[in-house]
Amino acid sequence: MFEAVEEVLREYADLERRLADPAVHADPRTARTLGRRYAQLGPIVEAYRRWKALDADVAAAHELAAADPAFRAEIPALEAEREAVAERLRSLLAPADPNDGKDVIMQIKAGEGGEESALFAGDLLRMYLRYAERRGWKTEILDATESDLGGYKDVTVAIRADGSEGAWSRLKFEGGVHRVQRVPVTESQGRIHTSAVGVLVMPEAEEVDVQIDPNDLRIDVFRSSGPGGQSVNTTDSAVRITHLPTGIVVSCQNEKSQLQNKETALRILRSRLLALAQEEAEAQAAAQRRSQVRTVDRSERIRTYNFPENRISDHRVNYKAYNLDQVLDGDLDGVIQALVDADAAARLAAAEQDPTRPVLSRQR
């Protein structure tokens, strides 16, 4: 009856044992992965233990009430609390996204709207950097192509979370087309323009996740360029890698060293290949990634940022708030939590259609 929970309890105990071994902490990456998984399972274990205790309390109350009716008054409150904990446990046991513990690579790309779109791409980058800063996460700009007015035609950033919650679990919903409505700095008559920026979010892949055959790669080198296309380096330090089987192309020119640019490009390529493999393997992942940017068109929007009204609207969950200035300063938890809750509800509904799901009724 509790097979799924028993598996969690066994894994939790095994992780507890492994994390107590000093040898594990000699490898920081392994220790971090195990610690994150241990923290993820903790709420399930805690809820299950609480449910078991309440189940025993309800049984004891029934036995006492049989001998003394005065104890009957305690039963409804105990049963209500037991059901509330059971509902939480059902939610925790709903199928989880296997990538939730991973870090993120995010690409922000200007679309329709010219220089104004590039400027808003810069605004989005700062928004995500501030959000990461608020949560104590680490960020790293992997590659960037600036526009003439200080925006970004294209920028790629890595975001790494600490603790049990991976950056993917919060930022995976940011993939798609973001539309901005405001008066551009280049607009002399005060007219409101609409521009679009595309955001692509990928779980960061490790080398063990994706094996790349060097024979499948074409590597080209070229000189780095800045705004307006001018050369900013006298050596061929920029790197472009083409993955021949898929046609995926990744360029990197952020570092002064060709070797560093190559390593960064491979890092991005691994994440793109992992995302592609999951898209092809899982219908759910495919549906999710189809909602992300394919062509940066103003009609394929997931979110609108309306400056005149100080309004942010997420069109997937009918979320609307009038705190755009705070959102752009990194206060994203309101809209992200609305998306997390909607996703959890959808996963729970799917799990409830599964006849093999654990049934949390009182043991007799």
Swiss-Prot record:
It comes from the Bacteria. The modification N5-methylglutamine is found at Q230. One of its GO terms (cellular component) is cytoplasm. Methylated by PrmC. Methylation increases the termination efficiency of RF1. It is found in: Cytoplasm. One of its GO terms (molecular function) is translation release factor activity, codon specific. It holds the Pfam family PCRF. Keywords: Cytoplasm, Methylation, Protein biosynthesis. Its main location: cytoplasm. InterPro entries: PCRF (IPR005139), Pep_chain_release_fac_I (IPR000352), Pep_chain_release_fac_I_sf (IPR045853), Prokaryotic/Mito_RF (IPR050057), RF-1 (IPR004373). PANTHER family: LD18447P. Belongs to the prokaryotic/mitochondrial release factor family. Peptide chain release factor 1 directs the termination of translation in response to the peptide chain termination codons UAG and UAA. This is Peptide chain release factor 1. The gene is prfA.
